[in-house]
Amino acid sequence: ETVSHVALRRIGDSLSLYCALGGISFSIDERNCLIIHAPHFSVKEFVTNDVVELVDSRNFRWIGRYDHVINTGGIKVFPELIEKKIAGLFTRRFFVTSCDDLKWGESVALVIEGEALSLEQEKIFLEKIRAKVNKYEFPRKVLYVQKFKETSSGKVIRNI
C-alpha cells in the first residue's frame, strides 16, 4: 500500500464516503484514479491505482482497482463492484476476475474456493447472480480452487 491512514469510512457501509483526515485532500487523474495530497509528508502527492468517484477535495467513494478492471467488448467492469453486489449469496470465499474471451477480449470469471458445485446447483446459483448484476457483469465462466493463495497479510491473491 502506498499510503495508509489518509481517510476514514463508516464500517459495514460499503456505499458510504471516505472522508479525508487532517490536512489531506484528494483529486483524480485522467483514469479517475485517486491522487492523495499530503502536505505534511515528504512526498506531497501520491498517485494511486484506486478508481474513485470524487465528491469533493475531501470525500470520495471507492470503485475498484484500475489494475483489476475487466474490459469486455469495450465496456469497463470493476470486479470489486460485482463482488459487492453478489456477496450475500456466498457462504465461502470467492473473487471476480477476468478470463480471455475470443469474441470480447476479456469476460468476467467467478472463482470460488472449495469443491465444485454440481451442474444443477451451479445453474441455480448463476440464476441468483443474474438477478443481481447487469449483462456485462455476469460471469461467463465459473472456476473452483481448492484453497486460495494469500499474501503474508492474508489478502487473497486474485490471479488464477
Task: State what each model feature region is.
Residues 27, 97, 142-145:
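General small-molecule cofactor/ligand-binding pocket signal
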Residues 30, 56, 103, 151-152:
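Short, ordered coil/turn segments that flank beta-strands lining enzyme active or ligand-binding pockets
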Residues 133-155:
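AMP-binding/adenylate-forming catalytic domain of the ANL superfamily
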Residues 51, 158-160:
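A short, well-structured catalytic beta-strand-centered motif of the EAL phosphodiesterase domain
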Residues 44-137:
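AMP-binding/adenylate-forming catalytic core of the ANL superfamily
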Residues 35, 61-63, 151, 156-157:
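Generic structural signal for well-ordered beta-strand positions
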Residues 1-59, 66-69:
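Conserved AMP-binding/adenylate-forming
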